């Protein structure tokens, strides 16, 4: 009896392949602009394990595909609307990376506020000598009012970690969260006007495109701090670089960018920006857990008839 065929377009965490190879036939193909598959092979594919985009046109080439397991909590690269129309279940990897991303958000906030990377670079350059000291950091976390743009699973973990710092916490989402005591603002502009620190942790959707623009940055003000661990899609990078250069915004800490891995030169230049190469979930334990969830979703689908973590748009409800 032939094994179920799973398509893997491009690279994916090696642990996913290790978990699946003894149960399924792995059809690994290079990632290219188009999906070049022999018709016979395409007709045997019943599942996809993917890290990155998977457009609707590719789904149309796979008449028997049932489930697409996405490596990552964000799944904006997968055409879920088209998948739903075709009855294809899409899964992601929520929860297993919440702690890591939340920890990174706090670390990035502290590094940005206290200029810790610059202080370390100053020391490594041999500048710490008798009679010298690194200049006082302009900002402190003490007494800040932090606004969370997004209060999903990760946003809530960030908020929990902020509480011991004794900062005031507020948030903006599409609707108020029941059972949450933080102040709620129905608009992002209202939140930005009220706070001096904004942490963005929202997904890539048409509604979040460049919502953090010049107007929002101006509302945060010259003492304002922006931290983004969500999606670069949400920030107008030209407006941000201009605000950092002019002093209209105090500082920014970014783990994500609009067109990764490209980082605009105007963001590399300001000394009041702390930049990371999208590493919020990038630890061995967390990536292993994400890989396990990709594999477990596929195994559960074919052995029990239900995925573990289907996305909301999927034909199978969580």
Question: What residues fall within each predicted segment?
Answer:
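C-terminal helix-to-coil terminal segments
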Residues: 3, 84, 91-103, 131, ...
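Glycine-rich Rossmann-fold phosphate-binding loop(s) that bind the pyrophosphate
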Residues: 151-152
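Phosphate-binding beta-alpha-beta segment of Rossmann-like dinucleotide-binding domains, i.e.
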Residues: 86, 94-145, 157
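Conserved beta-strand positions in the Rossmann-like core of class I SAM-dependent methyltransferases
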Residues: 27, 170, 233
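An N-terminal-biased, well-structured beta-alpha scaffold segment characteristic
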Residues: 1-91, 193, 213-218
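Phosphate-coordination loops involved in phosphoryl transfer and adenosine-cofactor binding
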Residues: 3, 65, 142-145, 223
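Rossmann-like adenosine-cofactor binding region
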Residues: 56, 175-266
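NAD(P)-binding Rossmann-fold cofactor-contacting core
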Residues: 164-180
């Amino acid at each position: 009896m032939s094994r179920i065929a799973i398509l893997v377009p491009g690279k994916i965490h090696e642990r996913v392949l290790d978990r699946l190879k003894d149960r399924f036939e792995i059809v690994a193909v290079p990632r290219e602009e188009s999906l070049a598959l022999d018709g016979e092979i395409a007709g045997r594919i019943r599942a996809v394990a993917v890290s990155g985009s998977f457009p609707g046109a590719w789904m149309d080439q796979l008449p028997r595909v049932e489930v697409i397991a996405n490596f990552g909590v964000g799944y904006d690269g997968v055409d879920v609307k088209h998948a739903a129309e075709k009855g294809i279940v899409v899964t992601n990897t929520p929860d297993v990376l919440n702690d890591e991303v939340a920890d990174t958000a706090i670390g990035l906030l502290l590094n940005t506020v206290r200029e810790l990377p610059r202080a370390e670079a100053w020391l490594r350059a041999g500048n710490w000598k008798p009679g010298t000291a690194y200049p006082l950091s302009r900002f402190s976390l003490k007494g800040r009012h932090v606004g969370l743009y997004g209060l999903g699973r990760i946003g809530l973990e960030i908020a929990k970690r902020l509480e011991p710092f004794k900062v005031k916490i507020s948030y903006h989402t599409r609707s108020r969260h029941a059972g949450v005591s933080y102040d709620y603002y129905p608009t992002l502009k209202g939140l930005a006007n009220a706070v001096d620190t904004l942490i963005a942790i929202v997904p890539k959707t048409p509604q979040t495109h460049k919502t953090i623009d010049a107007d929002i940055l101006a509302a945060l003000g010259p003492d304002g701090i922006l931290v983004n661990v969500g999606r670069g899609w949400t920030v107008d990078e030209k407006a941000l670089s201009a605000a950092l250069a002019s002093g209209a915004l105090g500082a920014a800490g970014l783990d994500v960018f609009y067109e990764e891995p490209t980082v605009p030169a105007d963001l590399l230049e300001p000394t009041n920006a702390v930049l990371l190469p999208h590493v919020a979930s990038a630890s061995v334990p967390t990536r292993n857990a994400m890989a396990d969830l990709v594999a477990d979703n596929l195994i559960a689908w074919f052995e029990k008839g239900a995925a573990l973590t289907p996305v909301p748009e999927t034909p199978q409800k969580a």
